[in-house]
């Protein structure tokens, strides 16, 4: 019998592993647009983009969404958040990618770590009442695993960082060792995302600022839809 605290950690490690088949390997979340413009060509330029993406997008979208799920008093609140978090993703590819990866995560999580909220979430998705955004799905799964809130936020943001860096390694391309150096450096940015989202949550304005993303990032993500040649789905 695995101790509860260890069980939660092991569940977290499984569900945030880059090998989890959610389809994250096929998304650049906008950095391919900068590649096409020859603005991402090496470690320095990709690191600058990734830091901005964490600070200006993930912090104010996914990180806050996870915290809002943790603060939810009932599942009806989660249903509202699922709709809200999906709607705030303005670029179509980002919105669709978030729900596609979220549904896959939910399917895997429901089989491995069933729970009341997980079951209701999956039922809502199957009935097309809920979207299944990845951030809210992860919030429900992490909460069910009794993962501490800050840890849930950090692991979700860091998983996105690792996935994007792995995609940049083969897309730009970067060397494998270079990719690992970027991932190590990104720990500081992940820490900022945790701290900033915690502060916004404690100030009671998490929902108010949810989706406050830098326009340049969203424009690049929208422009990706019209690129003539693409390696990634977003």
Swiss-Prot record:
One GO cellular component term, please give it: cytoplasm
Per UniProt, which keywords does this protein have? Chaperone, Cytoplasm, Nickel insertion
Stretches assigned to coiled coil: none
Q: Where would you find this protein in the cell?
A: Cytoplasm
Q: Name one Pfam family in it.
A: UreF
Name the major location: cytoplasm
Question: What molecular function does GO assign, one term?
Answer: nickel cation binding
Name the family the entry cites.
Answer: Belongs to the UreF family.
Protein's job: Required for maturation of urease via the functional incorporation of the urease nickel metallocenter.
**PANTHER family documented for this protein:** UREASE ACCESSORY PROTEIN F (PTHR33620:SF1)
Quote the subunit structure annotation: UreD, UreF and UreG form a complex that acts as a GTP-hydrolysis-dependent molecular chaperone, activating the urease apoprotein by helping to assemble the nickel containing metallocenter of UreC. The UreE protein probably delivers the nickel.
Q: What is this protein called?
A: Urease accessory protein UreF
């Amino acid at each position: 019998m695995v101790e509860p605290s260890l069980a939660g950690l092991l569940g977290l490690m499984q569900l945030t592993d880059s090998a989890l088949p959610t389809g994250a390997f096929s998304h650049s979340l906008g950095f391919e647009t900068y590649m096409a413009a020859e603005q991402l060509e090496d470690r320095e330029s990709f690191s600058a983009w990734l830091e901005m993406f964490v600070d200006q997008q993930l912090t104010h979208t996914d990180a806050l969404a996870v915290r809002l799920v943790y603060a939810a008093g009932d599942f009806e609140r989660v249903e509202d958040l699922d709709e809200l978090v999906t709607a705030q993703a303005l670029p179509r590819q980002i919105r669709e990618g978030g729900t596609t990866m979220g549904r896959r995560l939910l399917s895997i999580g429901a089989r491995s770590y069933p729970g009341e909220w997980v079951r209701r979430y999956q039922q809502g998705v199957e009935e097309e009442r809920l979207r299944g955004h990845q951030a809210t799905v992860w919030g429900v799964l992490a909460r069910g695993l009794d993962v501490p809130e800050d840890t849930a936020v950090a692991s979700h943001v860091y998983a996105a960082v690792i996935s994007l860096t792995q995609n940049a390694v083969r897309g730009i391309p970067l060397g494998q060792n270079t990719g690992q150096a970027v991932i190590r450096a990104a720990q500081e940015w992940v820490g900022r995302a945790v701290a900033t989202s915690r502060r916004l949550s404690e100030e009671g304005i998490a929902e108010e600022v949810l989706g406050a993303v830098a326009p340049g990032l969203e424009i690049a993500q929208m422009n990706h839809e019209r690129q003539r040649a693409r390696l990634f789905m977003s």
